[in-house]
Amino acid sequence: MRERILETATSLFVERGYDGVAMREISDACGITKAALYYHFTGKAELLSEIFTAYLDEIAVVVSAGVDGGGSAEAQLRRVVRGMFEVPVERRAILRLAMHDVGSLEAEHRAAFGQAYQKRFIGPLQQLIADGVAQGEFVPKDPELVVWMLLGMLYPFFAPSRGAHATAESGTVDDLLDIFCHGLGRTD
């Protein structure tokens, strides 16, 4: 039942945002009483925290797989981003939800998520960029800034309404990576 509640809450939060969903709506969508919902979760903030943690687990595996595959820093980065686009858009949308609604978590959960997000997602991406710079593959730029720029490019594709066409197999991902890694300038 917990998994069903989490799936339902995720869908509703992604669709309407954290503040746009009441516990009653989650219980109704699950076909359970509000009391039964509270038996499994103490409140919306706990639901949101578990959703974020589960997504972070999922995306950390994607990042690790991309980096652990070896090769050039660009090849690793391409594997990571393609891996992110192999995740269904409904799951990718959780990253948008996290960026928008992390402030709804209690301070302790927000801090814990922020630390885990940095350690398991942002930090490895920054290290990948730093390694590419150290190897002379990337121009010397601040890895933190570069990662935030990358996420800024990816962010629109994490919206269910716009991201459905962008998959690991679509040309969109390769175009995005080509522009990110090599710019828009002509090389001929």
Go through each PLM region and give its residues.
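Helix-turn-helix
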Residues: 4, 8-46, 50
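Amphipathic, non-transmembrane alpha-helical scaffold segments
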Residues: 6, 48, 52, 56, ...
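Short helix-capping/turn signature of helix-turn-helix
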Residues: 41, 99-105
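Hydrophobic alpha-helical connector segments
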Residues: 50, 64-93, 146-150, 173
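Amphipathic alpha-helical packing segments from all-alpha helical-bundle domains
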Residues: 57-65, 90, 108-134, 144-148, ...
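Hydrophobic/aromatic-rich alpha-helical bundle segments in the mid-to-C-terminal region
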Residues: 95-100, 111, 130-179, 187-188
